[in-house]
A protein has these predicted regions:
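Generic preference for well-ordered alpha-helical elements
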Residues: 2-6, 55, 72-76, 90-93
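Conserved C-terminal subdomain of P-loop nucleotide-binding cores
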Residues: 3, 13-16, 99-100
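Histidine (H) residue identity feature
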Residues: 5, 34, 71-73, 99, ...
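Regulatory extensions flanking the kinase catalytic core
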Residues: 69, 81, 87-111
Length: 111
């Protein structure tokens, strides 16, 4: 369901930014309670709760060995821009192609 999906997104990307949350509250007030995502609810299944709790932060999902630290930071930065909650703030294709991740020298990647 949509509420569960938003809860999963918060687990992976962090809390909804205040400005976006306020916008979302005007369209879907039933998803929020006292300024925060209203999840879990009393009727939320244990399966849903476990599934959402199993979500990892983005930087852990794309974890990499220390040899890739510079690349990892740039890659996570790019992903965060691509996955921005607010579509109006998401990186454009042109901006994505200019992102520092794509400026890395391929020869800098460990074998």
């Amino acid at each position: 369901d949509n509420l569960e999906h938003l809860a999963m997104m918060e687990m992976v990307l962090g809390k909804l930014p205040d400005d976006y949350r306020r916008k979302a509250e005007t369209y879907k007030p039933e998803y929020f309670y006292h300024g925060r995502l209203d999840y879990p609810r009393p009727d939320t299944s244990k399966q849903s709760r476990r599934f959402v709790q199993s979500m990892k932060p983005l930087q852990d999902i794309v974890a990499s060995p220390p040899a890739y630290a510079k690349h990892h930071h740039a890659f996570v930065s790019l992903l965060r821009r691509l996955l921005e909650f607010d579509p109006a703030k998401r990186i454009t294709v042109e901006e994505a192609l200019s992102h520092p991740y794509f400026q890395l020298d391929p020869h800098d990647f460990p074998p």
